[in-house]
Amino acid sequence: MNITVLTLFPEMFTALNHSIVARAQEEKRIELNYVNFRDYSTNRHGRVDDSPYGGGAGMLLMPQPIFDAIADLPEAKRRIIALTPTGRRFDQRLAEEWSKETDLVFLCGHYEGFDQRVHDELVTDEVSLGDFVLTGGELAAMTMIDATVRLLPDVLGKAASHEDDSFSTGLLEYPHYTRPADFRGLTVPEVLLSGNHARIETWRREQALRRTLERRPDLLETADLSETDRRYLQSISGLSND
């Protein structure tokens, strides 16, 4: 997978030189490139922003540097993703969708964002990290790149490493425990020490359902629930409201 980031601050992305994303680069599973679109400004001072037509607060990123930077990229069938608080909210399903692509381009905005013509003519995806506003798109891009890259084949070693992650099943993930079994009087649930895999799977599913009901009940509206799941949720729904 080729990933290109258009940004005014490429130095911010050194965080991706660590951990899983770094390993994916070392193993040639992804290629990460950063383009400072200020380099494409035709303004002799390297200016990339101007005041908006019609007035209003803030400055807007001009279309010319973005259009020229995109035109300079190698020809490819690509997703061009604008990071914007007005976009679709990023989620695990979108990360999974992107992980099947071969070429992603992230546009990191600043100030009041991009001239609308960038969105109309270049962008395939307008995506937001959440219902809040960041200073720029860089942190959002790093988050989305990490979430996408870890889903690529063999990046985590085996598929099971992410198949039970929160949101991958439509639910929040169940609690995890490791040694020691008793830490300062805080004990691991007995079922996890039982060796009974069927009981363990049931416990994990129920814990995921309970956690989702308590913390993100909105996810249950679209989760793939069995009749057993529904009965369990019904049995605890009164408790979760107490």
From Swiss-Prot:
SUPFAM superfamilies, A to Z: alpha/beta knot (SSF75217)
UniProt cross-references to Pfam families, sorted A to Z: tRNA_m1G_MT
Catalytic reactions of this protein: guanosine(37) in tRNA + S-adenosyl-L-methionine = N(1)-methylguanosine(37) in tRNA + S-adenosyl-L-homocysteine + H(+)
GO MF entries: tRNA (guanine(37)-N1)-methyltransferase activity
GO biological process, one term: tRNA N1-guanine methylation
E.C. designation(s): 2.1.1.228
Residues annotated for S-adenosyl-L-methionine binding in this entry: G109, L129, G130, D131, F132, V133, L134
Gene3D superfamilies assigned: 3.40.1280.10, tRNA(m1g37)methyltransferase, domain 2
Keyword Thylakoid included in the entry's annotation: no
Subunit structure: Homodimer.
Function: Specifically methylates guanosine-37 in various tRNAs.
HAMAP family linked to this entry: TrmD
Protein name: tRNA (guanine-N(1)-)-methyltransferase
Gene behind this protein: trmD
